[in-house]
């Protein structure tokens, strides 16, 4: 680290603590904001402060929100009969960007009795008819799906999970064997 530049070094360290940012990138970012574009630096600092102060989990689904209920849970145009279970609020952002789903969400970031009771209350309150699991494909996810399906089997729900397979533009040699196996077993007719 640069001697005599404590504030700069602290900024570099803060950037380097972020996911996917290495030390070289952290130095470039810090230099850019301190020297090349101080206005962007001040705007970034302000935006970070506001985001930390005002963004919180939605009281119903766990999505990112600036209000008690997020825009999705408040939207009367959404299909309120289907509920997509995700692992993280980031997953909601990704699914919303895809414009492939118009129902509600529930963030299941950990499997405990409190979360399961909250999920059950939402299912009953909103008269949910289908749970869609959009979880990372793994043995743990399969166990979670099986557990929830078993726990809520008396609630007259349809259970489904998102399809698995080969991403667009990826060569077969670069696909893991589990994904390749599932893609073959769950192939569709054309």
Curated annotation (Swiss-Prot):
Residues 81-167 form the Toprim domain. GO terms for molecular function: DNA binding; zinc ion binding. A zinc finger (C4-type) spans 58-73. Gene3D superfamilies: 3.40.1360.10, RecR Domain 1 (1.10.8.420). GO terms for biological process: DNA recombination; DNA repair. Keywords: DNA damage, DNA recombination, DNA repair, Metal-binding, Zinc, Zinc-finger. The keyword DNA repair applies. Belongs to the RecR family. This is Recombination protein RecR. It comes from Campylobacter jejuni subsp. jejuni serotype O:6 (strain 81116 / NCTC 11828). The lineage of its organism: Bacteria, Pseudomonadati, Campylobacterota, Epsilonproteobacteria, Campylobacterales. The gene is recR.
